[in-house]
Amino acid sequence: TAPLSEAEISIVRKHVSEGMEMLKGCEGVHPDVADIVAHHHERYNGSGYPRQLKNDQIPVFARIAGIIDTYDAMINDRPFAAAVAPADVIARLYTMRDVDFQAELIEEFIQTIGIYPAGSLVELTNGEVGVVVCESRKRRLRPKILLLLDSAKQALKETRYINLLETTHDARDRPLEILKGLDPGAYGLDPEELLI
């Protein structure tokens, strides 16, 4: 995973103009959709591309799409960077408030998807590892989890579900919660394969 060269960056950046060209041939495209395609790589501080727009010069739907696009890129493998755990991406996005992205939109995004969205690999305080399958709207840090590995990080003979809203303590009566998010691929687990 090496950084992109200047030539590769130039090629990647062409997708915006190429996307706009494709839209020209389509009838009935809503102007908001065209704005998203044209401006989803603009950044709140003017550091984006293709026009270095800043703040409210960037249409609101493009500002939202930029956050989503960045999140999606970071949680997935790319030729130049390995996938990052969703909780770590959320933390990174939070530091980008009022720099790359409008603070209020970042905060709404985090409220919407939660810290550990479905598909996140997590380790619990008892050492078990699983994948988040369903979030709790009321208590974001207490989702339903498909447990896959025991505390010794060995595959469970039978996977099982645990709802952290209902199960608040482990077998030793210690508080049970998410200790940390794990990078995709940790312990050889691929969340995408597990949830299909």
Language model segments and positions:
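Histidine- and acidic-residue-rich, metal-dependent catalytic cores
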Residues: T1-I196
